[in-house]
């Protein structure tokens, strides 16, 4: 049976998050299929609490090419429900697998993109700094990357 690269990416994300935040809470939400092709009713893949006072709602996405269309992020509307809640950071960890780069895009930044009429999230948006997209420091290891998610907390976590 072929390995789904996106699911394998989620496993790699889990390993890297736990390495970065060894004493943190991390919960993988089971996919609850809604009846639509490959669409879960959950707002995200993971609930993560690194111990810095913030709860992360993280959707993991793997995509080939230099951009991902919003149509490939069906969780957008559900994540948007958590925008602006104190202590909650909702967003997408995006691995552009052809480019070997990993990014964090908050739901607030995604909402700005949609309001600006954007149809996708692209590498160019990061490079020209038109939106606050955070690149996750990552090192290539064969197929996958070792990523350092502490950049999302500015290194702040409880001991």
Cite the ranges covered by each PLM segment:
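Acidic-basic catalytic patches of nuclease active cores, encompassing PD-(D/E)XK
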Residues: 1-37, 156-157
């Amino acid at each position: 049976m072929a390995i789904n690269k996106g699911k394998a990416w989620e496993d790699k994300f889990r390993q890297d998050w736990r390495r970065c935040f060894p004493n943190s809470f991390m919960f993988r939400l089971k996919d609850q299929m809604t009846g639509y092709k490959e669409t879960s009713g959950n707002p995200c893949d993971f609930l993560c609490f690194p111990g810095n006072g913030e709860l992360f709602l993280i959707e993991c996405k793997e995509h080939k090419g230099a951009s991902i269309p919003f149509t490939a992020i069906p969780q957008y509307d559900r994540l948007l429900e958590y925008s602006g809640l104190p202590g909650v950071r909702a967003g997408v960890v995006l691995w552009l697998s052809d480019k070997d780069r990993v990014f964090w895009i908050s739901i607030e930044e995604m909402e700005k993109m949609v309001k600006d009429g954007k149809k996708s999230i692209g590498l160019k948006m990061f490079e020209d700094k038109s939106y606050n997209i955070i690149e996750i420091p990552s090192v290539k290891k064969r197929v996958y990357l070792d990523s350092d998610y502490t950049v999302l907390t500015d290194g702040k976590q409880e001991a």
